[in-house]
Amino acid sequence: MAYLLREGTQRSTGNEVILNNIAVAKILLEMLKSSLGPKGLDKMLVEGQDVTITNDGATIVKNMEVQHPTAKLLIETAKTVDTEVGDGTTSVVVLAGLLLEKAEDLLNQKIHPTVIIEGYRKALNSSLELLKNIADKISPEDRKIVHDLVYTTLSSKFFSTEHTLEKIINLVIDASLAVLDKRDGSYDLDIKNIKIVKVNGGEFDDSELINGIVVDKEPTNENMPKRVENVKVMLADFPLKLEKTEISMKLGISDPTQIKGYLDEQTAYVKQMVDKIKAMGVKLFITQKDIDEIASYLMGKNGIMALKNVKRSDIELLSRATGAKIASSMKDANESDLGEAKLVEVRNLGKNKYLFIQSDKAKAVTVIIKGSNNMITDEAERSLNDAFNSIRNLLLEPYIVAGGGAVEEELAKRLRDDARKVIGKEQLAFNAFADALEEYVSILSETAGMDPISALTEIRHKHATGLKNAGIDVTKARIYDNMLELRVIDSLKVKEQVLKSATEAATAILKIDDMIAAAPAKQQPQPQQPNPYLG
């Protein structure tokens, strides 16, 4: 080995590696478990002068700068879950940590890692089948169900009053319905069509939904109108000015009148473009590129409102909101590419001015979030994104399960029944999987301020008597017989993703029995440069 690896390389093998990796996972588990559930505590993330206070799992893991490869694997797993379903990031790290914690007990009993891995995989497959049997199919058009799902998602957030929470829930649902596409009985919610604008100043209760797009730009000329109604809209990806050629040229001018002639030609070129825009009946011109002063003046003179240097993402949203196609050149522009807006006006938001482009048929909308400072508006944005994702998941897979740990406890109960049919030591892994799910429920009760042992024994008893939806009512710190009655529901898609990802991460870590840490490359000494001042 001394001749095989570079000097200074460190190598660990066997159970020592597995147990070390499990220890790392348990540290992450301890860090995140207090943030689990609606009553989970916040974390303060400090980076330089930036401070973030949140209990949002995705934000916490994205801001973690971990060094150990096992920790990195778990963090990447959480990020993947966030990308796939937009929720469950805390849950997946906690559950993976619990699965590894239970696996450690089996390893100490001399159970081989391969047996544990195979048992966990079989338990996962059983869990996914059981989930489908437990879940209830719903209609995505049932607003009450959608309301309850969003309520569950947002109940763990910072909203101060029930009135504020209800207002935000309805805002989220209305925004989702506005951009929802329905084709052949299926639904598609593209969250990218919902723009969130954060404004410092005002109360959170003043947040509002705009049927259209709000752009942080003002008209390019002060003589342009500040408000127009029922107008044609043109979107462009070209500048409104005389463009420079790719070939460098010099003009030889011998007479001052030649300068005037050149400027007149430039004005005539731009005027021709503005005249075409006017002839098409355009009253709002928006481009991703520049608009020169001559064009701005001429458009203002003709009562046309114009915006320049608008972000590509906003241009695409405006296309969805107004129905306008994005013209790539003035030559290709025609009336059939124009869109419509019911109202276009400049408004003040906080200390800045924004342009509101509204339409009754908008397929892209804007949610304006107001709050006293950046921390509040940033956390609100994260909360709304979670809510939008919960609706998207429900549309993709219209099944729900009871929340508050009810589904995890029911799975644990049924897995133990299935474990009796498993032959050999894999039965122990089956039961360990069930124990991890129950431990998850125990943590949920603990973050709600309950005694975890008492809570677990009570919820276990209720499920044993057939109350499959019994769970933890965190608002009153009690075990309730039917969480569906309390409007506490979760999306089946999120639960499936959390189970899959947590199990995959745990089994991947259990498969590692050799870790080789290469020694850092030795830096070659730099040759000393002669001092020119010495002889």
Curated annotation (Swiss-Prot):
Report the family membership: Belongs to the TCP-1 chaperonin family.
Q: Which terms in the Gene Ontology molecular function aspect does this entry carry?
A: ATP binding; ATP hydrolysis activity; ATP-dependent protein folding chaperone; unfolded protein binding
Name this polypeptide is given:
Thermosome subunit gamma
Which InterPro entries does this UniProt record tie to the protein?
Chaperone_TCP-1 (IPR017998), Chaperonin_TCP-1_CS (IPR002194), Cpn60/GroEL/TCP-1 (IPR002423), GroEL-like_apical_dom_sf (IPR027409), GROEL-like_equatorial_sf (IPR027413), TCP-1-like_intermed_sf (IPR027410), TCP-1_chaperonin (IPR053374), thermosome_alpha (IPR054827)
Q: Which NCBIfam families match?
A: thermosome_alpha, thermosome_arch, thermosome_beta
PROSITE patterns, from UniProt?
TCP1_1 (PS00750), TCP1_2 (PS00751)
PANTHER family hit by this protein:
CHAPERONIN (PTHR11353)
Q: Name one GO biological process term.
A: protein folding
Read off the Gene3D superfamilies from this record.
Answer: GroEL, GroEL-like equatorial domain, TCP-1-like chaperonin intermediate domain
**What are the alphabetically sorted keywords of the record?**
ATP-binding, Chaperone, Nucleotide-binding
Q: How does it assemble?
A: Forms a Heterooligomeric complex of two stacked eight-membered rings.
Q: What does this protein do?
A: Molecular chaperone; binds unfolded polypeptides in vitro, and has a weak ATPase activity.
